[in-house]
Amino acid sequence: MQRSPLEKASVISKLFFSWTRPILRKGYRQRLELSDIYQIPSADSADNLSEKLEREWDRELVSKKNPKLINALRRCFFWRFMFYGIILYLGEVTKAVQPLLLGRIIASYDPDNEAERSIAIYLGIGLCLLFIVRTLLLHPAIFGLHHIGMQMRIAMFSLIYKKTLKLSSRVLDKISIGQLVSLLSNNLNKFDEGLALAHFVWIAPLQVTLLMGLLWDLLQASAFCGLAFLIVLALFQAGLGRMMMKYRDQRAGKINERLVITSEMIENIQSVKAYCWEEAMEKMIENLRQTELKLTRKAAYVRYFNSSAFFFSGFFVVFLSVLPYALIKGIVLRRIFTTISFCIVLRMAVTRQFPWAVQTWYDSLGAINKIQDFLQKQEYKTLEYNLTTTEVVMENVTAFWEEGFGELFEKAKQNNDRKISNGDNSLFFSNFSLLGTPVLKDISFKIERGQLLAVAGSTGAGKTSLLMMIMGELEPSEGKIKHSGRISFCSQFSWIMPGTIKENIIFGVSYDEYRYRSVIKACQLEEDISKFAEKDNIVLGEGGIQLSGGQRARISLARAVYKDADLYLLDSPFGYLDVLTEKEIFESCVCKLMANKTRILVTSKMEHLKKADKILILHEGSSYFYGTFSELQNLRPDFSSKLMGYDSFDQFSAERRNSILTETLRRFSLEGDATVSWNETKKQSFKQTGEFGDKRKNSILNPINSIRKFSIVQKTPLQMNGIEEDSDEPLERRLSLVPDSEQGEAILPRSNVINTGPTFQRRRRQSVLNLMTRSSVNQGQSIHRKTATSTRKMSLAPQANLTEMDIYSRRLSQDSGLEISEEINEDDLKECFFDDVESIPTVTTWNTYLRYITIHKSLIFVLIWCLVIFLAEVAASLVVLWLLKETPPQDSGNSTKGANNSYAVIITSTSSYYVFYIYVGVADTLLALGLFRGLPLVHTLITVSKILHHKMLHSVLQAPMSTLNTLKAGGILNRFSKDMAILDDLLPLTIFDFIQLLLIVIGAVAVVSVLQPYIFLATVPVIAAFIILRAYFLHTSQQLKQLESEGRSPIFTHLVTSLKGLWTLRAFGRQPYFETLFHKALNLHTANWFLYLSTLRWFQMRIEMIFVIFFIAVTFISILTTGEGEGTVGIILTLAMNIMSTLQWAVNSSIDVDSLMRSVSRVFKFIDMPTEDSKPTKSVKPSKDGQLSKVMIIENQYVKKDDIWPSGGQMTVKDLTAKYTDGGNAILENISFSISPGQRVGLLGRTGSGKSTLLSAFLRLLNTEGEIQIDGVSWDSITLQQWRKAFGVIPQKVFIFSGTFRKNLDPYGQWNDQEIWKVADEVGLRSVIEQFPGKLDFVLVDGGNVLSHGHKQLICLARSVLSKAKILLLDEPSAHLDPITYQIIRRTLKQAFADCTVILSEHRIEAMLECQRFLVIEENKVRQYDSIQKLLSEKSLFQQAISSSDPLKLFPHRNSSKHKSRSKIAALQEETEEEVQETRL
């Protein structure tokens, strides 16, 4: 960044903003880079400003019981704020004085007032000087206020960020990330924009008082008629504003509904294409868009009338002020023209400035109070440590994640009494003692220096909470903790900060080469680092998106190990690693490298327990066992069930085995009933309305929710570049059925009840604490794949006795949750994170305007219509002027024109009624014409928006995956949310305003030029100068805006990154470093924003200077050339003053239009995306086996219905090569093999070897070369849709969209209910669907959050059965399944797909053993393609993976279908026992 010229600028340069010229010149000539931006003045640096405000806020906290943030702000900024306010007032006063001089000039032309004629020229000079003074006062004042607003925002940003790093985990649990981002973006922007308006809360009343005094002098009491009209108008506009908000609120629900489905479509675009659902999704979204646009039109019409009311009001104000006076006393012309000028200023003060100022104060004070509440939240307390301590001791420790359980108990009791009095006593007192269940109960252990403690337990047992308590994140309510305080921590979910691999591992600790190399080697990172060209200096993006899940996990572990500490806390560090890597790291790192350190390792692996010095097994928060492994075997023979999280199967009823949903439903209805009577947001159990549910305001992390019958866990895997597709799914802990998610960790990512209300359900806000406990992958947007939707898993841990009261207590506690923002528009918040670096031109091209205008033929006619009406208006005014000129001087009538082509035709007292008629007649005509002009324009522009949305949606759905892989999901969604909102809401009204203002100016210039042709000569250069200046400024301003927008993203990204790694940050004590990074991001944004404000002010000032020169020219031309006739001078000068203010407004409007048209450019960019080549690329030829008839029938469109192809499911793959993008590396090379009809083939390979890529290649979702044939038909000879319909797909990332069960199973509506129920029976879905009200018509929302992951898999199975597919592709179908659902799926696969070809990519060995052949993929190629016997006899990956099991024992399973079927319960029991021995590849 360059040094700012501002530092050396002179006073004159600062006053006229001339110091910005170099950047304006550079921006005009070339594209600006970040290096071209000037450094910020030291007074604006985040360090200085935050220190200043922090000091004052600390003073406020120390000195008062009730500290006020506004007092701290006042002490920092008040005097400068008032100084600029006074300057602003003086600038505004000049506006009120100008009409007095104008009146005197007009009076000097009165034949009876010859004496004043000589001083007219001096009055003209005085009037021009007033304009110059106004310009020199207003612009510095407005800039100064914007500058103070920016400084206040920076100081508060910093204060909020610092506070966030200090918040206790309990508070973080109650705040969602959306609320925090909203606090920073929505609330604080109010200071930037609003501070310049704030002073009008006192300036406007003073201005009105002054003007009314001056008008009283002119018109006496009748002046108040005009004021009364303006007050009524202001109230009318407020009413219209309220009506508009009503429509917009209704519309918000519809927009949310559309965006949810659009978002689901974008995130699952691969599945949409695999299922051939493009047309169905398009139709569904367009139907929602239709309803939304009806409300958009209503809101636009109301806004249009609101805007028009201002334009048309000018005439009536003058008319109502003048008429009573004229009727009673008659009137002289100069009073009329003076009145007109006064009324223009008055109108602005009453209808615009004062209401805006009041709104600004209301918003700003609200924002300050919210921030004040946030700054007073409870902070994290570090424990008191003794550095000489060598052991770790915990004595009788109990802890709660929640506080204030006594109050909750009372509240629940009252609520329960109320329920009993209503006759509903079925719910409570069953487990009342569990209200406020501690997360840890009476835990005691002691480990000496150098010992390894293994902590194990089922999901939600309290393992992570134990580590949190040692770190001080969770405060014990009883008991003692003792350790030295020198801690290192490795989180369960790996956290990567933006920076190099080396910076992530060293993490601010002093660099030691030997230690660093040892850690890299022990954590198995050497090979990974060597693959990168930059080695360990490769810069990792947000969340480390270039890395696989396993690599991220190992870097997080290396960071923890590199720090020299006394105690190492390792929370399931091996979750993402395959068996072999995990074994090596445990041996070399945990056991050898850290041998003399104290370690606490959360694990569920038997091998780790055997090696540990001490074992602590937790169960439901209590210490189930503490001791050595040998003691464990002797004392607790049943430990495996506690460790794994489920007991033996005979505890379950038959009903429970058939459908896990029964318990889920029971949980939902409990929660619904428990909350409905008192919860503000009336959450109800499965009560469907026509709309989807209300917006949720719950925290995501519900600590206590995790201790329930089923732990529902959120996972958001990221699929990466084809190289690491499988790797981002965390492998489960070996002896636990689900990832060991802690309470206070990955709990319901979205609402677990269905809300009913006016708006569609958005994604639930994520509490900050939950953000930390989820995989860092979630926020990272892969370059090549989209982030996956949340998937859920059910643990089989019965834990039945912990459900009702825990959920109830959690719901109660949510009343005390922090509500930072009542209404957070989270889709809008996305713009904080996804700012595409655009390749669109710096200024909107004429081509974009031309395409926009011609996309809907009616728009051209509407624009011509506007022009015709405008010409009629000008013609009318010229006719009136001509009539007036023809009238004899003694009866001279004169006309004038208000800000809207309205006329004030005033005749001397000969006929007051004649005045009245002309006024009303002319005004009515113009009012009608103005309305006719605007409404069709607004209506047509909304239709254009509708067409653009349709075209863009079609383009995205038809685009090839290679194109979509290069785009961020957030970027695509921004086009449908942010840009469509601009096209719907802002653009039509801004274009209307611009056209209206432009026509007013042209009309006024035309009238003036007719009256005084010389003025036309002055007008031409002014308009030319304005066009050149606008073009010159626009190039730079749009680039600065874009850079500012890009600079906003790092601020919010850094906030989210810090929150995800907050526990790690605090464990390593790196808060100051991260505060510095945050300040750097703030300063970068400030540099862009400050420069944008300065250049904008430069432009506004230059425009005003041109107008001042124009006005001086007009004044002197009219004074020197008019001769007799006060009317003409009056009209010319009044209109010239109008032209000044209106043309400036028009210029700003034109810049707004250009800025908004960039959204249109972005939309066109999406519309122009390439489409998939769906037509056959070669003619059909008979294959070698002579299946001529089959091939020929393919050309027939009814081929699918006749079930002729594919008939057997035979597949032949020849030389298949697959790439993700056109110029990318080959992910798979020269793959060749064939599959017999009905055969089952298993895909084997390490994480990231390309198994999922191969399945995508079969579906032609990638760039592929080579050939695949199904039953002799080549993929080149039929359409893409026909080819994909040959496959049934169960993807890794299950896709359930918001809609009914029926829609989800059959979006095209091809099958009747009978057929759907039949298939539901086959796959075991009937019992699931029947338990929902409405059955097939039950509406699923939020990705089907009421279903377990297993049931979603069953829906995918049912889709495949309905599609009559002969080839089934399964990608990790058991990845997140509990044993029961897994057995249902296995059974379904055996029965429903008995005669189908099945290709299976799977991690579970047991599932793979049912395959007849195996395809082993290594290094992008096929290594082996053989039967299981051959693979076991050779040294292969498969053989290594199951070396610990007895191969012979595994063999009977392969042919299990030939065995006589055993009783169902016995079979399930045996199969599930084998799950315990489960091994993963």
Curated annotation (Swiss-Prot):
Coiled coil: none
Main location: membrane
Species this chain originates from: Equus caballus
Lineage, uppermost ranks: Eukaryota, Metazoa, Chordata, Craniata, Vertebrata
Catalytic activity: ATP + H2O + closed Cl(-) channel = ADP + phosphate + open Cl(-) channel; chloride(in) = chloride(out); hydrogencarbonate(in) = hydrogencarbonate(out); ATP + H2O = ADP + phosphate + H(+)
CDD domains per the UniProt record, alphabetical: ABC_6TM_CFTR_D1, ABC_6TM_CFTR_D2, ABCC_CFTR1, ABCC_CFTR2
Motif annotated as PDZ-binding, chain positions: 1479-1481
Sites of Phosphothreonine modification: 716
Region (Interaction with GORASP2): 1387-1481
Residues joined by cross-link Glycyl lysine isopeptide (Lys-Gly) (interchain with G-Cter in ubiquitin): 687
NAD is among the record's keywords: no
Biased composition (Acidic residues): 1470-1481
Family annotation (InterPro entries): AAA+_ATPase, ABC1_TM_dom, ABC1_TM_sf, ABC_transporter-like_ATP-bd, ABC_transporter-like_CS, ABC_transporter_C-like, CFTR/ABCC7, CFTR1_ATP-bd_dom1
Protein name per UniProt: Cystic fibrosis transmembrane conductance regulator
Biological role stated in the UniProt entry: Epithelial ion channel that plays an important role in the regulation of epithelial ion and water transport and fluid homeostasis. Mediates the transport of chloride ions across the cell membrane. Possesses an intrinsic ATPase activity and utilizes ATP to gate its channel; the passive flow of anions through the channel is gated by cycles of ATP binding and hydrolysis by the ATP-binding domains. The ion channel is also permeable to HCO(3)(-); selectivity depends on the extracellular chloride concentration.
Domain ABC transporter as annotated: residue spans: 422-645, 1211-1444
PTM summary: N-glycosylated. Phosphorylated; cAMP treatment promotes phosphorylation and activates the channel. Dephosphorylation decreases the ATPase activity (in vitro). Phosphorylation at PKA sites activates the channel. Phosphorylation at PKC sites enhances the response to phosphorylation by PKA. Phosphorylated by AMPK; this inhibits channel activity.
Lipid-modified sites (S-palmitoyl cysteine): 523, 1396
Superkingdom of source: Eukaryota
Listed GO MF terms: ABC-type transporter activity; ATP binding; ATP hydrolysis activity; ATPase-coupled transmembrane transporter activity; bicarbonate transmembrane transporter activity; chloride channel activity; chloride channel inhibitor activity; chloride transmembrane transporter activity
SUPFAM superfamilies assigned to the protein according to its UniProt record, in alphabetical order: ABC transporter transmembrane region (SSF90123), P-loop containing nucleoside triphosphate hydrolases (SSF52540)
Start and end residues of each stretch annotated as Disordered: 1449-1481
Family: Belongs to the ABC transporter superfamily. ABCC family. CFTR transporter (TC 3.A.1.202) subfamily.
Sequence positions that bind ATP 2: 1220, 1245-1252
Membrane-topology annotation of the record: Multi-pass membrane protein
UniProt-listed PANTHER family: ATP-BINDING CASSETTE SUB-FAMILY C, CYSTIC FIBROSIS TRANSMEMBRANE CONDUCTANCE REGULATOR
